[in-house]
Amino acid sequence: MRFSRSFDIDVENGYGKGMAEFHPATAGIHLPQAGPASSGEAIQRAAVLAEDLGYADVWVSDHLAVPTGADYPPSAYIFEPFIAMTWAAAYTKRVGLGTTVLVLPMRNPLSVAKIVASLDHMSGGRVILGIAAGWLEAEFNALGVPFAERGPRTDEAIEILRRVWTDDHITADFPVHDAHFVSMRTKPQPLRHVPLWIGGHADIALRRAIDVGDGWHGAFLSPEQTERRVKKLREGRPEQSFPISMRTRWDALEDDNDVILAEIDHYREIGVTHFVPEPRQRTLDGYLRAMEIQADLFRRASVSMFDS
């Protein structure tokens, strides 16, 4: 099923005027987990507001260690994602809880599986685990994890997660992680199939999403950059139950709202089905106000605020 809506957009930037067909879409919001506006109170208040406004889900980012220097601004230094998600879960009842994205190969997958299963249980089945192989070599070096092995480690970690979440007893060897399971019990298990949304923009990441993912989660790509990736993803995963998500830098309090509306239309026209904007506000009040305005823009764009 697709929706049609009349819209006026910038012809010079490659968009026409008139009727366009859109895929059904939902919307989440990134929590103030990093930067000047971030705090425990900020995460709590933003999560509660997101639920009140009808957002489908709330999202947090992941870095364990970030180098100093101009290339890594203060906004790169963030609260631990699982703690932030748990904090948000404690104050909400409905919104999904997502990672955008967890750098999976830096972590012990058995530990991740246990944490996610516990959070999924305690939150009532709300976790969306966005994962990727990572890109910051210095971060891997600080953790003593071989950067060159991040691809195979990601693939094997996904296998471990799925096995831990579904098998009552596991006997298996996982050579990349040098992990050996002999009739291991790994309770609790999630309440349901935890969706794995695969992040990354390279062809190998798209192939991973097609082969083993439950969705794809991109970040900060323009509609033009996104289009070829959506085509490739839909060639392998044509079903509409496979979400194509995009994290954006939209700040509805600062940015031209007409431009945001036009970009929503353009993304939807090429097949994006979920949005995660991240306001750039430096104060909590500004962040919350940006969330309110963005929610109104999604409604104006006929984006469902949550998937019922």
Where do the model's predicted regions map?
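N-terminal beta1-alpha1-beta2 module of alpha/beta enzyme domains
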Residues: 1-91, 189-194, 285, 292-301, ...
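Short, acidic/polar
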Residues: 38-50, 115, 198-208, 255-266
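Active-site-adjacent beta->alpha loops and helix N-cap segments on the catalytic face
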Residues: 222-236, 283-292
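Internal, glycine-rich beta/alpha segment that forms the wall or movable "lid"
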Residues: 10-23, 66-72, 86, 99, ...
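Active-site mouth loops of central-metabolism enzymes
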Residues: 29-41, 100-110, 190-201, 247-258
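Hydrophobic faces of well-ordered beta-strands that scaffold small-molecule active sites
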Residues: 5, 27-31, 58-60, 97-99, ...
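Catalytic domains of carbohydrate-active enzymes, especially glycoside hydrolases
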Residues: 45-61, 210-215, 266-273
